[in-house]
């Protein structure tokens, strides 16, 4: 069966003029002027008209499907995939990445956006108000400046509770150097992203942080005698003192807009992680933190940029640095004549130590090591004891409670080494 195609206005005009030329009612020169073609091309059109008739004036691609056009079955498959429950909150850019990675369907962003829009499927971002971020130039070297922050969000489908994602991002390359999720913004989260950064990338020159009391003191506390003798001019936070030990310059950001790099990262991860967690059936923080270790590599491979300077400002972590003792909350305590001390109304005895009464010790607290005592560069274990008879009591919940209070809760407040 012969397929007929309708001519558009230009093709109809061209056919009419060439017919006049063939019939002798118009010269080649007149046809050339009227159509804006060369006389040589008009002669070719005359020859084609004589041989094939008016249909030869149709464009050569008429009725031909473009090579890039997707077949109906593939379009339907894309729609079926998009309508799956785990993709109900995915934006267009992320969905394009998922199609390529998971289903081996490669389409352009513009096609996918228009195709979904025609089928009344809009990106979740379409309904949001656009935030204006004043961009500044990136630092020239990786490791020259890192931005640190935490963001609360409902990351798990069907769970209305908010969980806080802690993160570090390199300003020059846009690479994530650490991600860790906790219930609230806390020292534990910041300890873990620092551990990831120091191990996998090295020690950066500086870190850009907001004015949180985790990073900076918010009141003019009186200096301890030790601090005055050492020449310290103002109090420092637990996190700040760790940065000083590492030689990292901690810079205070004036506003959230000043940390634009990490604010944009949060916008991206709020969208993507919800979908990624649904796809991978992740429903709690422990599973999420395991997943995030590999997700950092995936994200960096896709989104990192090449810094202006190939030389890195990161320096290797000294082998002598023990991260398990460095990334801890530290408190000064004085022991009694039984090698005991108290912390948060709980008494502890230091195990296997020969120490004089009234000696000052460092108490180290973290999720990684629990509660330990550092004395003469050596770590000692401790046990909770009864105040009445100085006998050890098996109450691991006491230790867990103190760790939780100092690492997950108290460290949201202004905590100094005391």
Residue ranges of model-derived segments:
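Short, basic alpha-helical/linker "hinge" immediately adjacent to a nucleic-acid-recognition surface
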Residues: 2, 8-9, 28-81
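Mobile genetic element proteins and their domesticated derivatives, centered on retroelements
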Residues: 17, 42-45, 53, 78, ...
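Short amphipathic helical patch at the helix-1/turn junction of helix-turn-helix
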Residues: 21-23, 86
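Basic, flexible linker segments flanking DNA-binding modules
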Residues: 57-154, 226-234, 312-319, 323
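Mobile-element integrase/transposase regions
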Residues: 101, 105, 117-176, 183-205, ...
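Acidic/histidine-rich, metal-coordinating catalytic segments
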Residues: 201-231, 312
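Charged alpha-helix within mobile-element recombinases
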Residues: 232, 238-308, 314-325
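C-terminal, beta-rich DNA-binding module of retroviral/retroelements integrases
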Residues: 296-418
């Amino acid at each position: 069966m012969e397929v007929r195609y309708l001519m558009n206005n230009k093709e109809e005009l061209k056919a009419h003029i060439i017919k006049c030329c063939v019939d002798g009612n118009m010269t080649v020169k007149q046809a050339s002027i009227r159509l804006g073609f060369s006389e040589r091309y008009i002669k070719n059109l005359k020859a084609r008209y004589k041989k094939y008739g008016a249909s030869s004036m149709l464009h050569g691609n008429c009725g031909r499907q473009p090579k890039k056009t997707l077949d109906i079955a593939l379009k339907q498959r894309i729609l079926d995939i998009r309508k799956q429950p785990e993709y109900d909150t995915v934006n267009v850019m992320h969905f394009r990445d998922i199609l390529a990675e998971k289903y081996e369907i490669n389409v352009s962003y513009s096609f996918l956006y228009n195709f979904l829009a025609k089928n009344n499927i809009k990106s979740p971002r379409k309904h949001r108000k656009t935030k204006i971020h004043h961009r500044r130039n990136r630092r020239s070297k990786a490791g020259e400046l890192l931005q640190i922050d935490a963001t609360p969000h409902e990351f798990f489908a069907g769970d209305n509770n908010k969980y806080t994602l802690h993160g570090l991002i390199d300003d020059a390359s846009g690479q994530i150097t650490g991600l860790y999720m906790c219930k609230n913004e806390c020292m534990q989260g910041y300890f873990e992203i620092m551990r990831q950064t120091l191990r996998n990338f090295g020690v950066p020159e500086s870190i850009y942080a907001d004015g949180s009391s985790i990073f900076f003191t918010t009141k003019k506390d009186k200096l301890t005698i030790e601090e005055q003798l050492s020449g310290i001019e103002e109090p420092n936070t637990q996190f700040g003192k760790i940065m000083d030990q590492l030689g990292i310059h901690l810079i205070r950001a004036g506003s959230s807009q000043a940390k634009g790099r990490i604010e944009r990262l949060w916008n991206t991860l709020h969208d993507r992680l919800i979908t990624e967690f649904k796809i991978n059936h992740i429903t709690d923080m422990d599973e999420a933190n395991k997943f995030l270790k590999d997700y950092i590599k995936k994200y960096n491979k896709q989104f990192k940029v090449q810094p202006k300077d190939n030389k890195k400002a990161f320096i290797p972590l000294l082998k002598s640095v023990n991260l398990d003792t460095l990334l801890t909350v530290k408190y000064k305590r004085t022991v009694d004549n039984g090698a005991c001390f108290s912390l948060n109304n709980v008494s502890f005895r230091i195990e296997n130590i020969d120490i004089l009464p009234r000696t000052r010790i460092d108490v180290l607290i973290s999720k990684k090591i629990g509660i330990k005592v550092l004395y003469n560069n050596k770590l000692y274990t401790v046990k909770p004891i009864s105040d009445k008879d100085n006998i050890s009591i098996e109450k691991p919940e006491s230790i867990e409670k103190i760790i939780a209070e100092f690492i997950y809760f108290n460290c949201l407040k202004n905590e100094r080494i005391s």
